[in-house]
């Protein structure tokens, strides 16, 4: 008997796919389309087990949908720009382009070795000018619409990587890649007006029925829509005002001080003549601007000479510069109510600022001890003059009315989300297609001159971008007036590239950003990736899709219909990482066990949304199962050569039992496939093989039917072996183009059933009975059974409880 030689099988199968262009996809309006997409990888140089799991999930879905008769698009590409390539190029003394392209070639071969059904004719790399030309074109359209703009902004500055970081890229006050302590710095930055779309991005979350609730909640919180009042505090002895936003105007009468950001113009102005304040502001620049960090870091402040007038009581209130106030949120100023806000309370305790209680609990028995903590619940107003006795709702309306009539405030809807800063001060990215002219200001490059090419003949150092030192790149004529001007040297944030790549896959060679194929394929039907992308990539892609829609490039409102967020791959309970020394090289596993085994293990070990714990014995178990599948085919190959058909009237009792088990498992597998519960689909395959092996006298026709069902369920998971056996057993040319099996409901109708017999709830017997028996007939047979009678003779039968074709319980006393 032949043995399972995975390397020969996988090589010959991949050769077949390559020769026949098996995975190439074209538009076909006669079929239902299905666009399956896994998040594109960064070309680091080697695949890790997280990649393997992610892309196996996508491949299983794509193959299953193809076997359902759908026209499936399953592309792959490379998120190729960004700092890691630049840093690696410096380290290895290569150009980022050369390093990236070399990595892409190797990783593509690794993906191929795993048998993924990618349509490589649609491959894109975001560093290719044919790709980034169109995002430059798109940026210019956004600029013309006023959706892209440049302004001075206080940013998170990574002093090691010499670039700006988004708030989300700062972890515990440090750069997410370099680990350096992040500083605050004011520089000119390019932005996209995501705030113009904040309401729509929030409202349309309700349309995302196929998204996990956790991701939707994270986006809702990140957009952070809140209704409140903007309150005007007049600066004493000045015509100026400080505006603050609050969602709790019921606490307005308890304001003890205002807090302003260290970068606030009023703080900077006073710092010119106050060296201690200037030093405090410099110290604040070294602290994190992440909200999570602000919540836990020590609250620090500096009392200024500025005083403001309370808009209702006319009391004089101090203004403090506080390290927990962000310039980017609202006006960069907050009203502080120490009695009713815990952060303000902590600050007030530190600096001996008095508290004023203006809210009491609805529960009159509750004692509020402001010496221990702030009382933050909503309740009834006290110490608030004419507003005393009002609850939150009535106080909100009354204070809004007063402030509006006095021109001291107005109702506002605020968003937590800010405009998206897209400038990066590094070389390896898409050049921003703008030119700076002393006379004309910022001017877009002429569209006929696109793409603005990134120079490749550069010398990289760790001290920022070399673009500013390349005369032939930076020195250009102004497109408006023709005078000497300077090209923009910032490059796009790499999230810019990954926000629209899914759309370019639909028409990768189009001589425009997108063509009509985009509307055939979009939206993506199934998108697979990690939940860590919930509030950056997934939100930016939704924003970009709406921008493209409003540009007339796509018709749909949302990019991704269904989202699957896969769990991490763990080893010894921790995420695999080089720093922990707990990685497993997929290539070693492929060489040792074969790609099908690696794929099968990654699908069987855990449900896709949960973390997968690495297990050597689990891999060996997957390999053992595939050897059993191969051996069953070897032992029964003569049967398949006979071209046998199933005749239901000739089926034996054993055949019917086996078919019941096979079709029950098929039914479960189809249900689990549609729910993306792939581990239980694999379990169904194992049960079917057990059924085929456990019955000694199965008809040949049932063996053929059962094994062909098994191969087709298993094919999306282990495509090489199933393709090979399908051909070897003369079942067809290509299993991928075979219809997925359907359940024979007749096989699920039993002639007999196994009845569990209980007496007073305790198991006493199991009886095989005819399925056509009525409940009364079943009861008669059970009570007449000799074994059962031995337990109930001389006892009174109180009642008989019958669960049809499952269980009967006889209650006696």
Curated annotation (Swiss-Prot):
Catalytic activity: tRNA(Leu) + L-leucine + ATP = L-leucyl-tRNA(Leu) + AMP + diphosphate
GO molecular function: aminoacyl-tRNA deacylase activity; ATP binding; leucine-tRNA ligase activity
Gene Ontology biological process terms, A to Z: leucyl-tRNA aminoacylation
Motif position, 'KMSKS' region: 575-579
EC number(s) stated in the UniProt entry for this protein: 6.1.1.4
One GO term describing the cellular component: cytosol
Binding-site residues, ATP: 578
Primary localisation category: cytoplasm
SUPFAM superfamilies named among the record's database cross-references: Anticodon-binding domain of a subclass of class I aminoacyl-tRNA synthetases, Nucleotidylyl transferase, ValRS/IleRS/LeuRS editing domain
Record flagged with keyword Cytoplasm: yes
Organism: Francisella tularensis subsp. novicida (strain U112)
Protein name as it appears in the record: Leucine--tRNA ligase
UniProt KW keywords: Aminoacyl-tRNA synthetase, ATP-binding, Cytoplasm, Ligase, Nucleotide-binding, Protein biosynthesis
Transmembrane stretches, start-end: none
Similarity remark: Belongs to the class-I aminoacyl-tRNA synthetase family.
Span of the annotated motif 'HIGH' region: 41-51
UniProt cross-references to InterPro entries, sorted A to Z: aa-tRNA-synth_I_CS, aa-tRNA-synth_Ia, Leu-tRNA-ligase, Leu_tRNA-synth_edit, M/V/L/I-tRNA-synth_anticd-bd, Methionyl/Leucyl_tRNA_Synth, Rossmann-like_a/b/a_fold, tRNAsynth_Ia_anticodon-bd
Enzyme class name: ligase
CDD domains, alphabetized: Anticodon_Ia_Leu_BEm, LeuRS_core
Location(s) in or outside the cell: Cytoplasm
